[in-house]
């Protein structure tokens, strides 16, 4: 079987939404060539576990690659992808060069080529993310391993927005907590919360593929009994009191459910937000404080910001 490799030259800001678009159109084997990864290896706080080849990366911007089966619908699928990407301009997302190209690859090339990009990565004090096909032995007794299949959906879980989210979970999740993951994607944050001791994790995503991916990855990590996954639009119709709510999505989406996050948090609970580009930081802060939240932590990585807010304890 022949496959078509679609390559999109864009910006770091556009990685997450374009990756989601590719998965929604049936693409497989997502690869992100981000030259900032080369800097992360040099400056890694926690120590990367692998080497990268600079020749694979663009000089500026990022390249997102994925694979589509070559069939009679390929042309329509590519046009659908281009149209969906251009729609991101509505959200004021910088698309950069926004160049789309196609090349033909054979199945045996496709089946192995993209795997060279994925190796175990230690992303916080306690958590290491590793692809399913890599053998990895923990280096300490308290190290927590999250296994992901990057070819299934939503990448590797090592994007700065995900790293910031997991570091937030590591700081604020306590054993026995109820955690909500809004916009769960691959389920990596839900898995992290469960491994950090959360008693229950409720994961929500509007995308059916994300729901399936979270369920599969939860089973892969043997924490599926703790993680309940539901197809849902943000927190619409949800009525529970969580200890922690985490959401790694666009700033414009976060501000749309700040009120629901407030309603579903216990007094003294934490709202961990990520996926926020620098120039949208104040937008999120303003909406959080207007609702009554207390912003207690701002964490940054490259152009991305994570904001942790607390619902004040009842007096």
Swiss-Prot record:
Coiled coil residues, start to end: none
One Gene Ontology cellular component: cytoplasm
Catalysed reaction equations from the record: L-lysyl-[protein] + 3 S-adenosyl-L-methionine = N(6),N(6),N(6)-trimethyl-L-lysyl-[protein] + 3 S-adenosyl-L-homocysteine + 3 H(+)
Keyword field: Cytoplasm, Methyltransferase, S-adenosyl-L-methionine, Transferase
Subcellular location: Cytoplasm
Main location as per UniProt: cytoplasm
Function as written in the Swiss-Prot or TrEMBL entry: Methylates ribosomal protein L11.
E.C. designation(s): 2.1.1.-
Binding site for S-adenosyl-L-methionine: 162, 183, 205, 248
Record family assignment: Belongs to the methyltransferase superfamily. PrmA family.
Secretion signal span: none
First-level EC class: transferase
Taxonomy, superkingdom: Bacteria
A GO BP annotation: methylation
One Gene Ontology molecular-function label: protein-lysine N-methyltransferase activity
Name of the protein this chain belongs to: Ribosomal protein L11 methyltransferase
SUPFAM superfamilies: S-adenosyl-L-methionine-dependent methyltransferases
Annotated InterPro entries: Ribosomal_L11_MeTrfase_PrmA, Ribosomal_PrmA_MeTrfase, SAM-dependent_MTases_sf
């Amino acid at each position: 079987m022949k496959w078509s490799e679609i390559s999109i030259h864009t910006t770091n800001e556009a990685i997450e939404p374009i990756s989601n678009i590719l998965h929604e159109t049936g693409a497989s084997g997502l690869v992100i060539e981000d030259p900032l990864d080369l800097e992360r290896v040099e400056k890694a706080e926690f120590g990367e576990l692998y080497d990268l080849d600079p020749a694979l990366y663009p000089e500026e911007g990022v390249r997102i690659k994925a694979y589509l089966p070559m069939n009679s619908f390929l042309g329509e699928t590519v046009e659908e992808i281009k149209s969906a990407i251009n729609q991101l301009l509505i959200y004021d997302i910088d698309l950069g060069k926004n160049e789309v190209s196609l090349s033909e690859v054979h199945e045996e090339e496709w089946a192995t080529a993209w795997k060279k990009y994925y190796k175990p990565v230690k992303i916080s004090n306690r958590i290491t993310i590793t692809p399913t096909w890599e053998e990895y032995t923990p280096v300490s007794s308290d190290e927590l391993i999250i296994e992901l299949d990057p070819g299934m959906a939503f990448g590797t879980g090592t994007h700065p927005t995900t790293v910031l989210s997991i570091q937030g979970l590591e700081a604020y999740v306590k054993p026995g907590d109820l955690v909500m993951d809004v916009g769960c994607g691959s389920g990596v944050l839900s898995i992290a919360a469960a491994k950090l001791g959360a008693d229950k994790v409720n994961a929500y995503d509007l995308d059916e593929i994300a729901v399936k991916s979270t369920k599969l990855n939860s089973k892969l990590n043997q924490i599926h009994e703790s993680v309940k996954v539901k197809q849902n639009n943000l927190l619409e119709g949800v009525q529970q009191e969580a200890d922690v709510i985490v959401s790694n999505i666009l700033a414009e989406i976060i501000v749309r459910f700040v009120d629901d996050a407030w309603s579903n948090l216990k007094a003294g609970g934490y709202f961990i937000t990520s996926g926020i580009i620098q120039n949208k930081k104040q937008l999120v802060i303003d909406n959080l404080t207007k609702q009554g939240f207390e912003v207690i932590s701002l964490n940054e990585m490259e152009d991305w910001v994570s904001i942790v807010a607390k619902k004040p304890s009842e007096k």
